[in-house]
């Protein structure tokens, strides 16, 4: 961004003071992340109060601050400030104002799983358009989305916004800020059933995106979810395109055929109308066929050429802890998929494990959260899949992970049960030898990267 404090305050209708006008180059809500020229927004929350860190923000070079406590002006002898009622509301208003100053394609990305990987694919595909601003990390909520939008620069050519959801109305709220003209929904899974009760309710929440797609816009939807999203399709004014990463739906606009997993990634044949093209992905997991297709659909609709699509996908590197494969000092191959877990990604990760060359195949599998009524059957299903794929050794971590282990054990797998990550590490230390391949995967709350860190020394 390249706006002054006065311009921002006047546009949004807030009182302000400027002793020395400076151009704001960014926005921060964490004083430790402030860069020279940033506008520091002091947020008040239940756990902390950003006003306590005004001095640190100014010492790090903040060009101005946004406060909701008037007494901070004298306490910290503030020179450049905007006085607001609520820092979070200000941040959202600022983002909405900045977004509407830019005549660029804005793409909203949501779905039960695969949002971040799909965003990574889309960012790579849109790079041919020029400067693309993309959600960093998991900045996909009511604070993260505005912070992403505040990264817009005069030369930005596209904006990709990941949108998370933990209840009805949240996608709607984020769309009011970002106003996406393009969108994609990766899938309607069982994650969040604990919060929303059913896949139908999850579909309703995710499909809040559709109402914001204008007549000139496009949304890409997973053909496997046709029945779930059907009630909400009429809310979309724009064009709907369907993609299918399973190779089963010949009616999908974008579909994959001849999917082949290998040790270094995945290849498949992309089909769109009469067009046929081989796609080479240097990433693992058959679920990434669907994720890449969703990104291809939007990129193609935005005018990215087929040749550029093929070349860009060869170079994609996904956000960390998503099927990262590395060799430990002791010669063990480690597959780090510890960022998060759901039933489909668990089964896909097990498939990646079994496609690796090497010695014995070991799966360290932990709890999957927020599955609601599907909790027991989903964990049991993963255990059966481990047995079907003939995993040599399963280490089941956690109370829910034990359901995976019991199911795998009943189906013939060798299984050890660990109450926590430390016990899982002890089992691995006693079992592993050079050339064994280990998959580590569980929900974010399990923090199973601790196991990976131990394995990697």
What function would you assign to each model-found segment?
Residues 47, 319, 338-413:
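Active-site beta-alpha connecting loops in nucleotide-dependent enzymes
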Residues 82-86, 415-424:
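Short acidic-hydrophobic, aromatic-tinged amphipathic segments that line or gate anion-handling sites
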Residues 109, 320-324, 445-453:
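ATP-dependent carboxylate/acyl-activation modules
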């Amino acid at each position: 961004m390249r706006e002054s404090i006065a311009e921002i305050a006047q546009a949004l209708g807030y009182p302000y003071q400027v002793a020395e006008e400076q151009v704001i180059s960014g926005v921060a809500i964490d004083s430790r992340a402030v860069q020279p020229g940033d506008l520091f927004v002091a947020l008040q929350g239940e756990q902390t109060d950003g006003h306590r860190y005004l001095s640190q923000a100014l010492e790090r070079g903040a060009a101005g601050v946004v406060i909701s406590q008037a007494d901070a002006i004298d306490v910290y002898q503030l020179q450049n400030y905007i006085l607001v009622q609520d820092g979070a509301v200000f941040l959202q208003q600022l983002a909405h104002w900045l977004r509407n100053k830019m005549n660029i394609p804005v793409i909203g990305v949501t779905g039960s799983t695969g949002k971040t990987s799909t965003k990574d694919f889309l960012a790579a595909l849109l790079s041919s358009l020029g400067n693309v601003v993309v959600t960093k990390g998991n900045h996909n909520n009511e604070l993260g989305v505005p912070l992403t939008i505040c990264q817009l620069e005069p030369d930005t050519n596209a904006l990709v916004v990941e949108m998370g959801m933990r209840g009805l109305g949240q996608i709607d709220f984020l769309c009011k800020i970002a106003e996406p003209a393009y969108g994609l929904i990766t899938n309607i899974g069982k994650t969040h059933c604990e919060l929303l009760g059913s896949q139908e309710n999850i579909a309703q929440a995710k499909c809040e995106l559709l109402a914001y797609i204008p007549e000139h816009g496009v949304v890409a939807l997973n053909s496997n979810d046709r029945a779930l999203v059907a009630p909400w399709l009429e809310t979309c004014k724009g064009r709907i395109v369907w993609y299918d990463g399973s190779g089963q739906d010949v009616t999908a606009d974008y579909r994959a055929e001849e999917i082949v997993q290998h040790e270094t990634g995945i290849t498949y044949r992309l089909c769109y109308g009469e067009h046929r093209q081989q796609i080479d992905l240097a990433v693992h997991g058959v679920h990434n066929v669907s994720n890449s297709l969703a990104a291809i659909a939007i990129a193609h609709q935005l005018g990215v050429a087929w040749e550029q699509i093929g070349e860009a996908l060869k170079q994609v590197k996904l956000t960390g802890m998503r099927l990262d494969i590395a060799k430990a000092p002791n010669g063990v191959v480690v597959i780090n998929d510890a960022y998060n877990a759901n039933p489909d990604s668990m089964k896909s990760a097990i498939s990646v494990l079994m496609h690796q060359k090497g010695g014995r195949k070991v799966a360290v599998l932990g709890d999957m959260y927020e599955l609601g009524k599907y909790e027991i059957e989903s964990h049991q299903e993963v255990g059966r899949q481990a047995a079907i794929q003939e995993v040599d050794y399963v280490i089941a971590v956690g109370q829910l992970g034990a359901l995976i282990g019991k199911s795998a054990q009943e189906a013939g797998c060798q299984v050890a049960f660990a109450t926590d990550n430390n016990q899982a590490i002890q089992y691995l230390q006693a079992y592993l030898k050079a050339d064994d391949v280990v998959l580590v995967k569980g929900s974010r709350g399990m923090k199973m990267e601790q196991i990976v860190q131990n394995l990697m020394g």
